[in-house]
Amino acid sequence: LRSRGLGDVYKRQDRRSPTYWQENLFSNHYIWNTPLSKENETRFEVKFSVPDFAFEAGAWQGVVSDKIYYASDSNVAQHAGSVSLTSVYARKDFRLGGLHLDNRVLLQWSTDQEVVPVPLLSAFLSYYYEFWVVRDVLRLQIGLDGRYNTRYYAPGYNPALSVYYNQREVEVGNYPYMDAFVMAKWKRMRIFLKYQHVNKGLFCLLYTS
């Protein structure tokens, strides 16, 4: 079914068939011929926004039955039952002259972390200063983007299959990851420069454990 909305309340229902490669694979390292059922997902979403105050909040819940995923051994698997994922988020942007402070916080709960792993808390921040270098000709943004999430077993990547699998060995999180950036807009041209992980080595915590 297609999405349908009533104001700021939405409902969506999807029924997804497994791909050919999810059911059939023959390679040097992996071989399987696994008939899979269709996934069924029902999702409800509510959203509230106040544009004049640059504020938005919302929540959504999705229930997926017969979820198809790649297990810790990278073999395809199908969950016998339903998994529920609930998310609550808030976004608030502040502006003081040319200073922009954009903030977004997300809370998530999964009823089965081995099937749908998610961090409990995630935060996304973008702080930058915007100003004219040459009025109506060249404009600059200089700032930092930051990301943070609590520890969880983030999916690992298997290059032999080109898929992400649900590993249960290494927890990722409890570490602020920051990028410095400069963006210039000159007439119709945009130039973007980024220095990734600018805070590397500043904290004793390990990013991947």
Regions found by a protein language model. Give the residues of each.
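Exposed, low-structure sequence patches enriched in small/polar residues
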Residues: 1-209
